[in-house]
Amino acid sequence: MQDAIQAGLGVLSSVQYVELGAIKIFSDGALGGWTAWLTNVYSDDKGNCGFNIHSTAELERIVQDARKYRLPVAVHAIGDQAILEVASTLKKYPLPNKWRERI
């Protein structure tokens, strides 16, 4: 994100072959690899509920950094716990313009 900002890119600005639409964040993994972050354990992998890639504090910092530049975020969140965490963070730090977030 910092490189894009330093290059003067903002929402829908572009350079050759690249257009910035949102800051992409990965919050968890995938269901097939048992890494999507769930509120309950996987039925076929007891003791495993997946994991979050960023702590709550790290996720909030990334979103706050995007907000400094009025950038929306697009978040990969597959598991229900990941979706809850991301939705809570986005509600806490709303986007101050017309652009839309994506989960």
Residue ranges and their predicted role:
Residues 1-80, 84, 88:
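Metal-coordinating catalytic core of metallo-dependent amide/deamination hydrolases
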Residues 12-13, 92-99:
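Short helix-capping segments at alpha-helix termini
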Residues 23, 102-103:
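Extended hydrophobic secondary-structure segments that form protein cores and membrane-embedded regions
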